[in-house]
């Protein structure tokens, strides 16, 4: 996948806007060139896939199922070119259909990455769960836009992009809480996590694990610092395992 033409990243207050276009060398290159090195690091490898047709998703899932990856994460915030470019992740029907298609070709645990650009995240989550998802991850980016006031053109060549970083964190916490209360499968929380306090908050909302992305632009060691802070918090609180945090929020 070639990705989008530049400019494709713009800084925003408390975050970034990007329209990179999921540029990558492809699943075959990943399996042959990148995966062997990743497995040498003695870490769990989760392969993220994205496509423009159900067939593309299924083909990638099938190939990765025969590889040594530990899990497949399916990004459904992509346009379905067979249905007018509408994103796969914006309706229960399309989420259920793409999950069912990939599940039929996937031998690995399957995690579905949900879009926040929906009216009811809980019903979307249930649709993915009902069609065989083993876990859910959320949130993906919120759609946003910036305009150069001198040229009067959008700053990003794609016109719009995905907003990530601390600006979306409260939205992510809310959606993780709603999703965790609607499904029985594990929920992985993401969206603006940059400190260990954010990680604790996300897990209290219902996340069993977290992902860190945008914070790495400013601090490549952010995940290590988050882990260290999280361990200190557990010790201070007398909590034996991080799993005990998941969903422990006390709503009013």
Please describe what each predicted stretch is.
Residues 193-195, 217-218:
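Short Gly/Pro-enriched loop/turn and capping motifs at secondary-structure junctions
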Residues 52-188, 194-212:
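Alpha/beta enzyme core
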Residues 28-35, 96, 100, 173-180, ...:
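Predominant activation on well-ordered alpha-helical scaffold segments within soluble catalytic domains
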Residues 39-40, 66, 104-107, 134, ...:
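Generic secondary-structure signature for well-ordered alpha-helical cores
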Residues 1-43:
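Glycine-rich, positively charged N-terminal anion/phosphate-binding segment
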Residues 243-252:
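A short, charged, Gly/Pro-tolerant segment at domain boundaries
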Residues 3-13, 147-161, 203, 215-240:
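C-terminal helical cap(s) of enzyme catalytic domains, especially alpha/beta-barrels
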